[in-house]
């Protein structure tokens, strides 16, 4: 933790536990996949891949808990997961295309905070 535990709300502590667990599950997925790639025994490789898939299941259960218990996670998951097309264009689509009247440019009246355009207009 980066702040004294006694200063954190119960909600923040619960989120911390979930986020820490999610990180650990994803790290375990990586380890099992690497071990499976490096393994020369077919039966052991299948066991390692089975274990990896279980860790993915645990990670997704934790991600779902985060979605259900935190509005910020819920909003981002709704925006980015299970979408089609280029991932980097999803935000533009979700915020009205990032034009001057939407939420993605300078002086726009959108409901999101922006820092304006990164490139000068020509």
State where each predicted segment sits.
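Iron-associated oxidoreductase/ferritin-like identity signal
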Residues: 1-122
């Amino acid at each position: 933790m980066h702040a004294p535990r006694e200063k954190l709300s119960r909600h923040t502590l619960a989120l911390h536990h979930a986020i820490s667990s999610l990180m650990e599950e994803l790290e375990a997925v990586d380890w099992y996949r690497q071990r499976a790639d490096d393994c020369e025994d077919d039966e052991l490789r299948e066991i390692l891949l089975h274990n990896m898939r279980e860790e993915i299941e645990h990670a997704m259960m934790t991600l779902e808990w985060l979605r259900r218990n935190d509005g910020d996670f819920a909003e981002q998951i709704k925006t980015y997961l299970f979408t089609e097309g280029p991932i980097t264009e999803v935000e533009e689509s979700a915020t009205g295309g990032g034009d001057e009247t939407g939420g993605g440019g300078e002086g726009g009246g959108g409901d999101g905070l922006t820092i304006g355009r990164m490139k000068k207009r020509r």
